[in-house]
Amino acid sequence: HVHLVFVTRYRRQIFDYDATEKLRTYFSNVCADFEAELVEMDGEPDHVHLLINYPPKLAISSLVNSLKGVSGRLLRRDRPDIAVRYYYKGVLWSPGYFASSCGGAPISVIRQYIEQQQTPGQVENRALYPRPEGWGFTAHRIKSAI
């Protein structure tokens, strides 16, 4: 499993509930194309978290490039209101991404953390969701081509 985080360009507050649900569909379809599984996905107005189960032969960088590229194009097509206001030179995502191997923490803990992200459009108190216990794994910030 890998935990990925993608941030919007300039950390712009872009995603509402509808956009987040569209992204979930796009990400799930891309994962299926790579014979991977989107286990969990959630986020906030300026970033998304994904938990993906992927085959060992798959290069994470290839998956990330496709996830970011496809989601950016499809969201621009399906939500022109977002594209007009927030896309900078046709780009939705910041160039880098966060990727972390999930071998050091139980998948249930990581899944719980992602589920507890405050989805745009939901009214929840973030103080109710402290960082879960057992949150210990190796993290790498990697710059992508997109």
Region annotations inferred by a language model:
Residues H1-I146:
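Basic nucleic-acid-binding interfaces
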